[in-house]
């Protein structure tokens, strides 16, 4: 199991293929020489559910046998890790927002995940953008005063919100920096500024409504609803999480949990299933222990 940053559509194809090749070579060096690869599972953002044969060949061709490769969106592997492949729903809300639900017939429904330019509702990017717009509204006297404005002015050393425009339009001010800005605002204003708190409540409600739509569309009728959540907004933004949970609980009895396993182990589970390996509780514990030990070795 190995992970690295990959976006199938948001990065140059040559760069993504280079990363895939590096991951495979790194794995080969870590494993005993006699080991033979039989099944490959690769997850990448920018892919919805299962990749097409054309996508697999473009990404994996001449690196490893793409016909024996399972290439899926990162939401699919996140879901596998979260639920261990069982029926349920996973709400991912970090830099972006993606909801994935699976019913008893193992049919997947995915909503969101379109990226910031197409409005990932409730995401950290979305929150940061709404905060900047709230500061602009205050400046233009079309909205209430907010502590967001002095916070932005102090951090970016500007006199007013007009000075922020060259900053956010700079090519290096990526969507990840919007997400970092959202986290910084939450740390500074999380329980004090009413404008900021309302933005966070709106974010949680938007993600909750998207989750309800995914559940309804999937036909998932399990009660209580197995609902898993991940991503910085739902894990650390208290106002957003409270609003998200209240929105879901207004319609369903819920069993709310964090993912059982990390996304990278979801990819491992897909490969094991394709190799007809049964996913038992003991195997899950082994995966968890191995992952923990590897992380400890790397940190030391």
Regions found by a protein language model. Name each.
Residues 46-50, 95-97, 234-235:
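Gly/Ser/Thr-rich loops at beta-strand to alpha-helix junctions
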Residues 8-9, 25-70, 82-83:
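Short beta-strand-loop/turn "lid" adjacent to the catalytic site in phosphate-handling enzymes
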Residues 67-91, 107:
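Conserved phosphate-binding catalytic cores of ATP/NTP-utilizing and phosphoryl-transfer enzymes
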Residues 60-64, 68, 107-115, 246-255:
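Glycine/charged-rich beta-loop-alpha catalytic/anionic-binding loops adjacent to active sites
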Residues 1-37, 82-87, 133-300:
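ATP-binding/phosphotransfer module of carbohydrate and carboxylate kinases, centering on a glycine-rich
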Residues 86-143, 300:
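Glycine-rich phosphate-binding loop of actin/hexokinase-like ATP-binding domains
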Residues 3, 72, 111:
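Hydrophobic residues at beta-strand termini and immediately following loops
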Residues 77-78, 98-100, 264:
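Short gly/pro/ser/thr-enriched loop/turn and capping motifs at secondary-structure boundaries
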């Amino acid at each position: 199991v190995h992970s690295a940053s990959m976006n199938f559509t948001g990065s140059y194809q040559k760069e993504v293929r280079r990363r895939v090749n590096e991951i495979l070579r790194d794995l080969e060096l870590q494993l005993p020489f006699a080991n033979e690869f039989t099944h490959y599972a690769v997850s990448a953002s920018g892919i919805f559910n299962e990749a097409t044969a054309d996508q697999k060949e473009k990404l994996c061709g001449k690196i490893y046998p793409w016909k024996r490769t399972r290439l899926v969106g990162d939401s699919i592997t996140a879901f596998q890790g979260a639920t261990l492949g069982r029926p349920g729903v996973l709400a991912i809300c970090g830099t972006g927002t993606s909801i994935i639900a699976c019913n008893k017939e193992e049919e997947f429904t995915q909503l969101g995940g379109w990226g910031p330019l197409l409005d990932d509702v409730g995401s950290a990017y979305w929150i940061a953008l709404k905060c900047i717009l709230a500061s602009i509204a205050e400046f233009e006297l079309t909205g209430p005063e907010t502590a967001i404005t002095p916070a932005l002015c102090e951090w970016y050393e500007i006199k007013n919100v007009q000075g922020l425009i060259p900053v956010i339009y700079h090519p290096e001010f990526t969507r990840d920096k919007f997400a970092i800005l959202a986290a910084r605002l939450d740390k500074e204003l999380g329980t004090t500024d009413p404008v900021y708190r309302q933005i966070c409540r709106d974010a949680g409600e938007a993600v909750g409504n998207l989750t309800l739509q995914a559940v309804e569309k999937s036909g998932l009728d399990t009660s209580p609803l197995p609902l898993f959540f991940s991503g910085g907004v739902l894990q650390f933004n208290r106002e957003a999480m409270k609003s998200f949970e209240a929105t879901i609980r207004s319609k369903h009895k819920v069993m709310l949990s964090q993912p059982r396993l990390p996304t990278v182990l979801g990819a491992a589970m897909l490969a094991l299933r394709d190799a007809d390996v049964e996913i038992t509780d003991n195997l899950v514990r082994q995966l968890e222990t191995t992952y923990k030990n590897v992380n400890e070795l790397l940190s030391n």
